[in-house]
Structure formats: structure tokens, C-alpha cells
Design a protein with these regions (language model features):
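Membrane-anchoring hydrophobic segments
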Residues: 1-76
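Membrane-embedded alpha-helical segments of integral membrane proteins
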Residues: 71-128
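Internal/C-terminal transmembrane anchor helices
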Residues: 132-159
Length: 314
């Protein structure tokens, strides 16, 4: 029974940390250490799982529960696991315990009262029949374990949008720009900071002037560089240093704000001949020419085109 509970706990904890909360823990450690240390998902999941299992062994050595209440010795490590992955979706620059600052001590007090009660009456429990996987004792304890796992799922961070956003942050931070852009395309909603990382990623792969508007963009020129928005992982200085002298960033800023008159004045300095202008620059220049003549392109506008972005709801 003890071995079965340990296996179930370790498998759940490792899978939960490695497959579901890995990106969240990367962000948590980054903020907690002020960017001085980096969380490695596979190694971190193994180490945290081992530490939590050792915590359970320590708790059981004190309580010495061996019957129906044995699985209760897993509550302290389950509580630690929950708090570790309960980072707020509104986090910006630092980690706070929030409600857990008072809720965790309260739960531990209630836990101590419960286990003392269980320990007091454990000698009087009737023997449970069955051995191995047909043992009633095993399934009672596994039921308690599953209730604990449900507790983890309910009170840790399970915000889908936040998970998607942090995944993009981690991929960009690790220079996996193509993967980040694929993740962004799968997001149902994007915010201004994700838009900034979208522009940065497209620029890093060299397609700012021919594929940027295939992605959802919000915020206009304000999200081009850090200022009003910031990345959770990537320092502002990294983005600014990589883009401060970029002609494409300057022209893209005009296009994001739909400022075609200013765009046309600058684009002719860098691309005087229409035939050498990249896709969006040529399209925007032609669009400006039509608009100055009082003409408007007929909808529908092709998705991924600058014209579609220009006439989209502002």
C-alpha cells in the first residue's frame, strides 16, 4: 500500500510539473531570483518530486499512520506543490504569497487536528480484508490521494491564457522564435505584451516586412518596444538593443499606427523603387496612393495582408 501510494504520488507530481507547469515554474524562479537563476524543467521536476516525497517520509516518521489514514501524510507535500504552482496570473516583477500567507497556516492547523484524531483512533480500526490491488485499504488511501490531486488542480494556476502567454515568453527567451510564433497562432486571445514578442520574433527571423500581419496584433506603435508594455522574462535592454537601429522597426511603427503619410515619406528614402519594396511596404504604398485619390479597395481583404489590418476594427 505504501509503495503504491508513493508511485502514484511521484508519477503525478513529475507529470504535473514537467508537462503542465514547467513554463510557470520557469517564470516563478526567474522572478523569485530576479533573473539570476534559471529553472530547468526536466531536472527541476525530478528534484521537486524527490524533495516532496522525502517530505512525506518525514511527516510519516512523526505521525506513524499505517492504515486508512496513511495517505493523509501526503497533505503537507501536496500543499507545498500547490503553493509552488499557484503564481498569480497578474504577476509582473515579483512573487507574492497572496492568500496563501494566511490560508496555508490555517490548513496546516486543521490538518494537525485531523491527523491527531485519526492517529488516536487508528488502533481501534477493524482489519480490512484483501491484499494487493483488491485491498480495500489500498483503494481508501488512493481515494484520498486522488482528492489531494484534485485540490492541486483546483487551487494552483490553471489559467489557460496565462499558460499560453508564459509559454511564448519562455520560447522567445530561449531563442526559439519559430516555435513561439506557432504557439502565438494557436492563441485565441493576445495582449499587448504578446504582440510585442510577436513583432520581436518575426523580426528575429527576418520576416517583419512580409509576414507580420499574419498574426493578431493589438496596441499599435505603443507595443513595438518596451515602454508601456514589458516582457515577463526578456529584459527590456535585450529588445531595445536588437531593434534600436532597425529600419524595419521604424517603418513597422508607422504601419501599426496606420500612419501612411509618414510611412510613405520614409519608405521612399530606403526603397525608392517600388519593385524592390518588400510585400507590406509595396502594399501600404499602393494603399496610400488609393486613399489620397479618394478611393478605397473593395472588401473582403485577404487575411494576412496589410490592407486587412488597416481596415480592421481599431
Amino acid at each position: 500500500m505504501r509503495i503504491s501510494c508513493a508511485i502514484v504520488f511521484c508519477v503525478f507530481t513529475f507529470c504535473y510539473l514537467y508537462f503542465y507547469q514547467a513554463d510557470i515554474l520557469v517564470l516563478t524562479q526567474h522572478l523569485a531570483s530576479n533573473g539570476q537563476t534559471h529553472y530547468v524543467p526536466f531536472l527541476g521536476a525530478i528534484l521537486i518530486t524527490l524533495v516532496l516525497q522525502l517530505c512525506q517520509i518525514g511527516v510519516n516518521s512523526l505521525l506513524k499512520l499505517s492504515k486508512r489514514g496513511y495517505a493523509l501524510t501526503y497533505f503537507p507535500p501536496v500543499l507545498l506543490l500547490t503553493i509552488l504552482t499557484a503564481i498569480s496570473s497578474d504577476v509582473t516583477t515579483s512573487i507574492t504569497f497572496g492568500v496563501w500567507a494566511w490560508l496555508a497556516p490555517l490548513l496546516l492547523i486543521l490538518y494537525v487536528v485531523l491527523v491527531l484524531y485519526v492517529r488516536h483512533y487508528e488502533p481501534y480500526e477493524p482489519e480490512v480484508r484483501g491484499v494487493g490491488f483488491i485491498s480495500r485499504l489500498l483503494w481508501i488511501n488512493l481515494g484520498t490521494m486522488f482528492a489531494f490531486f484534485l485540490f492541486v488542480g483546483m487551487f494552483s494556476n490553471s489559467d489557460k491564457h496565462f499558460h499560453e502567454k508564459v509559454k511564448v515568453e519562455v520560447l522567445v527567451h530561449n531563442h526559439k522564435y519559430h516555435n513561439a510564433l506557432r504557439a502565438i497562432q494557436q492563441m485565441q486571445n493576445v495582449d499587448s505584451s504578446t504582440t510585442m514578442l510577436t513583432i520581436y520574433s518575426v523580426a528575429r527571423i527576418g520576416h517583419l516586412s512580409d509576414s507580420l500581419y499574419e498574426y493578431c496584433l493589438v496596441g499599435g506603435n505603443d507595443v513595438l518596444r518596451p515602454g508601456k508594455v514589458h516582457s515577463l522574462l526578456l529584459p527590456d535592454s535585450v529588445i531595445n538593443k536588437a531593434t534600436k537601429n532597425s529600419i524595419h522597426y521604424q517603418l513597422t511603427g508607422f504601419l501599426l499606427d496606420r500612419n501612411l503619410p509618414k510611412f510613405t515619406r520614409f519608405v521612399t528614402k530606403y526603397y525608392p523603387v517600388d519593385s524592390i519594396r518588400p510585400r507590406y511596404y509595396a502594399e501600404a504604398y499602393k494603399l496610400h496612393t488609393l486613399l489620397t485619390k479618394g478611393l478605397t479597395p473593395k472588401p473582403p481583404y485577404a487575411k494576412g495582408s496589410y490592407t486587412h489590418y488597416y481596415f480592421a476594427k481599431k
